[in-house]
């Protein structure tokens, strides 16, 4: 979709990855060449640019972050199966989902994008990179993926949240890439009551540290990971900068959308039942 009057166009990274070139077709039939401005595999976002927008073409307005609610009607626009300019309607089925990084090698295997929107609006091959709109015509997400065993819509589609557009796209335009914060930790995704007992924790809410990289910001800050043999003894993160953390996804959302490399954050942890505050200076994601 058209992002601004300078001719920047937002799409999915996986749509343009590996392509020698890309062109865009506007609703009036104008077909224009583009140049790649920036791309980010971890969020599956990319920005293209045309030299000048056709007359009458205007950018789509972005919704405010966190304005979407479960049950709200949304409209998906794209080119499913090559059918240009198709629109489909559905509801927001869920919020706070996550998508794995599009990068296939290296340490990025453990990275994921938080805050992803789940919708039952039909999303099929060709919808990728198109906007997900609210009924006010504002962009609330970028259609990215479907959960299906057949490769076509099964009522479970996923869209990158608009907060990622607010946070990441300006960096892609200015410097061609987005630099994420990095702690050097791996966590249990969510803790069940059984996990609480297994790990010897006093509560099940929080992000439990399973391992940390030697020499990482987390290691230098003095955080503790679980014993690899017993699974016990790791720190349980319960708040960051005063914001409660109920699970890893909430911690990941804070890091991805509200922090920057070089920033020092205050992490509240439970260690052997005792509440501690640990200062950690964030690094850059490899």
What are these regions (language model features)?
Residues 128-129, 192-198, 212-236:
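PDZ/PDZ-like domain micro-motif
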């Amino acid at each position: 979709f058209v992002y601004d009057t300078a001719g920047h166009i937002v799409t999915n990274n996986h749509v343009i990855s590996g392509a020698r070139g890309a062109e865009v077709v506007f609703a009036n039939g104008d077909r224009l060449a583009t140049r790649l401005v920036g791309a980010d595999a971890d969020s599956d976002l990319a920005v293209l640019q045309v030299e000048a927008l056709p007359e009458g073409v205007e950018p789509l307005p972005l919704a405010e972050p966190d304005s979407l609610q479960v049950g709200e009607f949304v409209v998906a626009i794209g080119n499913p199966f090559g059918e240009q300019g198709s629109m489909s309607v559905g509801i927001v089925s869920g919020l706070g989902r996550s998508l794995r990084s599009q990068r296939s090698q290296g340490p990025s295997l453990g990275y994921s994008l938080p805050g992803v929107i789940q919708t039952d609006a039909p999303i099929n091959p060709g919808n990728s990179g198109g906007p997900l709109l609210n009924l006010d015509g504002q962009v609330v997400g970028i259609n990215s993926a479907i959960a299906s065993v057949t490769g076509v819509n099964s009522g479970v589609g996923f869209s990158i949240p608009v907060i990622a557009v607010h946070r990441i796209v300006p960096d892609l335009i200015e410097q061609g890439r987005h630099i994420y914060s990095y702690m050097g930790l791996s966590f249990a995704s969510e803790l069940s009551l059984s996990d609480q007992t297994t790990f010897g924790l006093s509560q099940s809410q929080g992000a439990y540290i399973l391992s940390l990289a030697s020499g990482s910001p987390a290691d230098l800050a003095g955080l503790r990971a679980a014993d690899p043999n017993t699974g016990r003894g790791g720190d349980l993160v319960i708040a960051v900068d005063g914001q409660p953390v109920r699970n890893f996804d909430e911690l990941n959302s804070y890091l991805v959308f509200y922090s920057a490399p070089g920033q020092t954050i205050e992490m509240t942890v439970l260690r052997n039942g005792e509440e501690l505050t640990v200062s950690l200076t964030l690094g850059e994601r490899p």
